[in-house]
Amino acid sequence: MEKNGNNRKLRVCVATCNRADYSKLAPIMFGIKTEPEFFELDVVVLGSHLIDDYGNTYRMIEQDDFDINTRLHTIVRGEDEAAMVESVGLALVKLPDVLNRLKPDIMIVHGDRFDALALATSAALMNIRILHIEGGEVSGTIDDSIRHAITKLAHYHVCCTRSAEQHLISMCEDHDRILLAGCPSYDKLLSAKNKDYMSIIRMWLGDDVKSKDYIVALQHPVTTDIKHSIKMFELTLDALISFNKRTLVLFPNIDAGSKEMVRVMRKKGIEHHPNFRAVKHVPFDQFIQLVAHAGCMIGNSSCGVREVGAFGTPVINLGTRQIGRETGENVLHVRDADTQDKILQALHLQFGKQYPCSKIYGDGNAVPRILKFLKSIDLQEPLQKKFCFPPVKENISQDIDHILETLSALAVDLGGTNLRVAIVSMKGEIVKKYTQFNPKTYEERINLILQMCVEAAAEAVKLNCRILGVGISTGGRVNPREGIVLHSTKLIQEWNSVDLRTPLSDTLHLPVWVDNDGNCAALAERKFGQGKGLENFVTLITGTGIGGGIIHQHELIHGSSFCAAELGHLVVSLDGPDCSCGSHGCIEAYASGMALQREAKKLHDEDLLLVEGMSVPKDEAVGALHLIQAAKLGNAKAQSILRTAGTALGLGVVNILHTMNPSLVILSGVLASHYIHIVKDVIRQQALSSVQDVDVVVSDLVDPALLGAASMVLDYTTRRIY
């Protein structure tokens, strides 16, 4: 597991700025502390942790038994825009000495605060690796700009949701350095015990308060519109006073505008009002219980849209500060909280409800994933970041490497019978190809793949080909993000839950991509074939089985569980023959090579296959090609079987046309030319008139699986990795 390039421990510096980010960083810190054989932990505390007005929250870090290596007073008081800028500058002045003394291998920073921006800037300029927690999220304020700026400085990213992961990818961050882990606070939140919650409620809200009969209010200034956010806070307090329920009010973050918000609280007498409890800080484990058993939470804190959903507690989200975040159904947005009546109406609608619990932001297992991710960091890798930019128009200028070497990929095709490895050039030329029988066991197969790839890589040097990576096409269902074969076809034994990426990458020291053969056929058409330049098309590959791939808006569709484009298992008959998938009536049960072989054997056993001009040697197995030969020589029964097979395939294509409405359907594989005319006839007879003009063509690619495997590598390099 260790990849840090030497035998010493990884020195990790965790820097925390305020009570909110500590709730996310503390679970990671506890996790690091439990593995002293792998990690050394340094803790740096700065920002509002060290300010009395905000509760001196550094004390809770000490209470958690963490040694604080450094305390940095970095907040310039004033709570306005200029003070925030000066605070960043003060942190930038102080941090270099600290980082020079600690010499961390990696610094962990969280979120979107201006303090975190100072930390990331310092570490980046001092060539210290940065792990950013909760990047890629969208809220809707200046926080977005700060968060995304930290993302560009950070070398590694831990995100909480699939959407955040996609945002990071769209920001051109290196895919291999992004971890979808979930929110670390959920590890503690989802395991919280409820038995003492009443004592916590009484401690903070009074002895007479019952569960679900109080409100938690947490509102911060919006630094891009301070005047409006202060007015909204004033209206919120008026609505809460009118609603007449016991309310716990937490002081706002130390942002521009926070001082004015505190003045509003004091002007309205909130600190002395019998229905209010105003506090600077609540420990996170107690805060969890308070929001879990509240009748409602109101304000604009990220906690309301992130953590509170795990309990189904009603939330009223005021204004635009969190408007871009993913939320559960427990959140009621009041974007224009411009009247007391509107906020009061929201309180009446939400208070006391119980919503389904949602776990959008985590499953309680983030910390183990993060620790594993940390252990995998290779300190010998170049520090310079790589960005994956989208495809651009090819540069007409020349590169000396392109002249002296042929940029190429190693392509691997795992078929039911053969295992093939090829060197494929950027132009789609197969420079060299190796073929072996596919072994029956996992161990033999993986060893043969490694052996063939090593041999091909050595040959590539002699052929002046620079190998950029390895692409693998295999039958079955594949998780291309992880490079894992989830479930294989029955033709490839011992090939379920197989990690292909790791052994090849470790052996060849090259990036590795994996996908199934149907998807690879579509990728081959997109880069080298008749799908080049098309926005939408579908490929059907006919061979031993039936597969396919769907290109939509120039991108390959994988589906939520990587099961998209299993086109061979479209059902075209309710009472058709059994299929290898366990169902019946699938296209594959009619039109695949296996299906034709089955029918050929039946005819042969009944002495109805052979016609004049045909013979089958005794040592040769009867197969699909014999059936096709018999049909060509006039065997009516063989012709009928092929017609039925082509009709089944044609009905599948009709269903695809009605579902996807692609601009082109490409039939690929050894049987495509035998089916094309029947498929077109079925479309004319069965399809809606509006899709009958869609082109259906036979692929002109000789090795679509190999070319598609290569295209995964070659497409990636054209994204201009820097």
UniProtKB/Swiss-Prot annotation:
Its EC number is 3.2.1.183, 2.7.1.60. GO terms for molecular function: ATP binding; hydrolase activity, hydrolyzing O-glycosyl compounds; metal ion binding; N-acylmannosamine kinase activity; UDP-N-acetylglucosamine 2-epimerase activity. Highest expression in liver and placenta. Also found in heart, brain, lung, kidney, skeletal muscle and pancreas. Isoform 1 is expressed in heart, brain, kidney, liver, placenta, lung, spleen, pancreas, skeletal muscle and colon. Isoform 2 is expressed mainly in placenta, but also in brain, kidney, liver, lung, pancreas and colon. Isoform 3 is expressed at low level in kidney, liver, placenta and colon. Zn(2+) binds at residues 569, 579, 581, 586. One of its GO terms (biological process) is CMP-N-acetylneuraminate biosynthetic process. Residues 406-722 are annotated as: N-acetylmannosamine kinase. Pathway: Amino-sugar metabolism; N-acetylneuraminate biosynthesis. Changing residue 157 to Y: In THC12; likely pathogenic. CMP-N-acetyl-beta-neuraminate binds at residues 259, 271, 280-281. It is found in: Cytoplasm, Cytosol. Bifunctional enzyme that possesses both UDP-N-acetylglucosamine 2-epimerase and N-acetylmannosamine kinase activities, and serves as the initiator of the biosynthetic pathway leading to the production of N-acetylneuraminic acid (NeuAc), a critical precursor in the synthesis of sialic acids. By catalyzing this pivotal and rate-limiting step in sialic acid biosynthesis, this enzyme assumes a pivotal role in governing the regulation of cell surface sialylation, playing a role in embryonic angiogenesis. Homodimer. Homotetramer. Homohexamer. The hexameric form exhibits both enzyme activities, whereas the dimeric form only catalyzes the phosphorylation of N-acyl-D-mannosamine. This is Bifunctional UDP-N-acetylglucosamine 2-epimerase/N-acetylmannosamine kinase. It comes from Homo sapiens (Human).
